[in-house]
Regions:
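N-terminal carbohydrate-binding accessory modules
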Residues: 1-50
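Substrate-binding/catalytic cleft of secreted carbohydrate-active enzymes
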Residues: 47-53, 57-185
Length: 185
């Protein structure tokens, strides 16, 4: 059993009041020998390799992981950024994005809230990611409000739609953008 409190204060990520430098990886459920089926033993070896490599964070790319993976992350102390299975970047970020039409709102909200309900009791989950590269529309605004109404204990994340979440990211930064963010350090 574990407990955690996650706060972002003055751009510092705090877990249980302690600053944490997140050192993470993206993880897809796949294995070179078994394909998209990963055995419990293979999952455990993955998590143990992460610990040996001083990795403390996993982003579930681009869908929630097998339930056993969360058990292992709870057991070994790996932080998880849980990501909803919403990826529609074939429509990318324009007005064609499925994140805009109101008729797609129930699908967005349902997928995100299903992830939250399924994994809300895992202390390893330190952040809810609304999805991946699926546009900046109103459907994500609605879903983020639903997440916060259900769980205020974790920050929310989404790629590029940074104005609606607690922690945004730019997964394809230009060299100039990266330099400007680094402040020539």
């Amino acid at each position: 059993m574990g407990f955690r409190n996650v706060v972002i204060k003055d751009s510092v990520f705090l877990v249980n009041g302690q600053p944490v430098k997140v050192k993470g990886v993206n993880r897809h459920e796949s294995h070179p020998e078994t394909g998209h089926y990963v055995t419990p033993e293979q999952m455990e070896e993955e998590v143990r390799m992460m610990k040996r490599a001083n990795i403390n964070h996993v982003r579930c790319s681009h869908y929630p992981a097998d339930p056993y993976f969360y058990y292992l992350c709870d057991k070994y102390g790996i932080y998880v950024q849980d990501e909803a299975n919403i990826e529609s970047h074939g429509y990318y970020y324009g007005k064609e994005s499925l994140s805009h039409p109101i008729e797609w709102m129930p699908a967005h909200v349902d997928r995100i809230m299903a992830m939250v309900e399924r994994n809300k009791n895992h202390p390893c989950v330190i952040m809810w990611s609304l999805g991946n590269e699926a546009g900046p529309g109103q459907n994500f605004r609605s879903a983020e409000k639903m997440v916060k109404a259900r769980d205020m204990s974790r920050p929310t994340h989404y790629e590029r739609n940074n104005d609606i979440v607690d922690l945004g990211s730019n997964q394809y930064p230009s060299v100039d953008w990266t330099r400007s963010m680094a402040g020539n350090k």
